[in-house]
């Protein structure tokens, strides 16, 4: 999926999950030496998927909806139920989930081990981070980027500044002949899916 390189922060998160998958597969091979490589791959994939769900449900979602709404609508995890449909609604995937675009910072922060600005590889304007995986390889790796994601808050939305300019006026301009507008793309996607 080419979107892994959409921006270097996203690239660093994907690399983290791939590394964890591979670490788990190696550990599972020691515990289950008769498993095929396909079984090792799939079992590690399931565990990483579960990690991701735990992070989203327990760490991310309470900050998004607030503790009262979280407890009222989700509450304690009742355990796996094979009768629950795991799919998401088209309206959520197409429209509602796009709300996270509003929390994207105009800067991709790279921080040192003390969570301070990285002097050797400074933070990067978002529009210069689109489809530039070489920045990860040649400019300090994923650790400074992951520290930037952890150590700096998401952008706070204000009524007059919802979506940063890099997403409205410079989307992919650094690597493309023309810039795109993410808000316009989101609206068009909704129209394509028949969302009012």
What do the PLM-derived regions correspond to, one by one?
Residues 1-196:
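Long, well-ordered alpha/beta core segments of mature domains
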């Amino acid at each position: 999926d080419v979107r892994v390189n959409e921006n270097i922060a996203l690239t660093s998160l994907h690399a983290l999950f791939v590394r964890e998958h591979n670490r788990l597969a190696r550990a599972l091979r020691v515990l289950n030496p008769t498993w095929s490589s396909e079984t090792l791959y799939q079992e590690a994939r399931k565990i990483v998927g579960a990690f991701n769900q735990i992070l989203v449900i327990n760490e991310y979602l309470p900050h998004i909806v607030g503790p009262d709404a979280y407890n009222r609508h989700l509450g304690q995890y009742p355990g796996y139920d094979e009768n629950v449909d795991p799919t998401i609604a088209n309206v959520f995937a197409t429209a509602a989930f796009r709300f996270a675009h509003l929390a994207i910072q105009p800067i991709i922060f790279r921080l040192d081990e003390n969570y301070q600005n990285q002097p050797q590889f400074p933070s990067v304007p978002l529009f210069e981070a689109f489809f530039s995986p070489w920045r990860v390889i040649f400019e300090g790796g994923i650790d400074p980027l992951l520290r930037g994601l952890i150590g700096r808050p998401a952008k706070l939305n204000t009524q007059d500044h919802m979506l940063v300019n890099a997403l409205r006026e410079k989307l992919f301009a650094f690597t493309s002949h023309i810039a795109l507008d993410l808000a316009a793309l989101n609206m068009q996607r909704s129209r394509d899916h028949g969302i009012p």
